[in-house]
């Protein structure tokens, strides 16, 4: 039997954080909660992503941690401190100043003739090689710019590209993203020392970036928690885990 409902109500737990897309699910959750006479737990979209990564731990860290949110529409590094009741005090400390990580991937993939969204297709190309001509990575004061690397990658695309050229460029794109993420995280762990990094969002389902973050965190003595690939894309599992966790902790 259903004993509770978890739902996304807004993008972030901030004043004036609003997006019409969340109203549909919120309304459905409110209706079901009323009809079934069960509690409704409302989370921020960002909290859901974080909870999706924490579900395998079965508990929520009480110490502050960094959450890397990398998706088609978001590139953010968030300083988080759990306040209880499923609520995180959070502060965006880094991210991208222009293109988001997913946009960078999609623009290059589509320009190379791949279907949209291009992430999985570009990853498949990148996995065919370990060779590439490096692309730049731009990070200033803990903030990334993907526009420059994207422009540099675009200049390499032509109709005369061989399959090998395409694989090499795909590898270079993901390597440049990984380089930028490492620089950004390193900057902010010096500013706000933490022991845990949680990586969430659809782009984190990419095997190359996951491996890159695993290697980086091991080298940097950070505990890394990443939502399983199938849960990185769809954060509904975060809603479910958050609701179940709250009800269990409340008895």
Which stretches of residues belong to each language-model region?
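Short beta-strand-loop/turn "lid" adjacent to the catalytic site in phosphate-handling enzymes
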Residues: 1-27
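Short glycine-aspartate micro-motif
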Residues: 4-6, 21, 65-69, 198
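Conserved phosphate-binding catalytic cores of ATP/NTP-utilizing and phosphoryl-transfer enzymes
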Residues: 38, 42-66, 241-243
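Glycine-rich phosphate-binding/hydrolytic loop that grips phosphoryl groups
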Residues: 49-52, 227-251
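A short helix-loop
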Residues: 61-63, 68-71, 76-164, 245, ...
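Adenine-nucleotide phosphate-binding core of ATP-dependent small-molecule kinases
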Residues: 141-147, 151-198
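Glycine-rich phosphate-binding loops at beta-strand->alpha-helix junctions
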Residues: 194-213
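Conserved phosphate-binding/catalytic loops in two-lobed NTP-binding clefts
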Residues: 197, 214-239
């Amino acid at each position: 039997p259903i004993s509770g409902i978890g739902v996304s109500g807004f993008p972030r737990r901030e004043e004036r954080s609003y997006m019409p897309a969340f109203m549909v699910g919120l309304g459905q959750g409110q209706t079901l909660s009323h009809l079934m006479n069960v509690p409704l737990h409302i989370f921020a979209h960002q909290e859901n992503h974080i909870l999706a990564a924490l579900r395998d731990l079965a508990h929520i860290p009480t110490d502050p941690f960094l959450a890397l949110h990398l998706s088609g529409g978001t590139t953010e590094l968030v300083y988080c401190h759990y306040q209880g009741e499923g609520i995180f005090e959070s502060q965006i400390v880094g991210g991208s100043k222009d293109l988001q990580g997913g946009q960078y991937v999609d623009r290059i993939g589509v320009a190379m003739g791949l279907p949209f969204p291009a992430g999985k297709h570009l990853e498949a190309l990148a996995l065919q090689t370990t060779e590439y001509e490096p692309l730049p990575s731009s990070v200033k004061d803990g903030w990334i710019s993907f526009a420059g690397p994207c422009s540099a990658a675009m200049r390499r695309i032509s109709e005369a590209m061989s399959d090998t050229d395409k694989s090499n460029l795909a590898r270079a794109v993901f390597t440049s993203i990984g380089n930028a993420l490492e620089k950004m995280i390193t900057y902010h762990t010096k500013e706000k020392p933490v022991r845990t990094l949680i990586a969430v969002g659809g782009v984190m389902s990419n095997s190359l970036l996951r491996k890159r973050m695993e290697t980086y965190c091991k080298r940097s003595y950070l505990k890394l928690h990443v939502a399983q690939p199938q849960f990185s894309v769809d954060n509904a599992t975060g809603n479910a885990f958050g609701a179940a966790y709250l009800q269990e902790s409340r008895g």
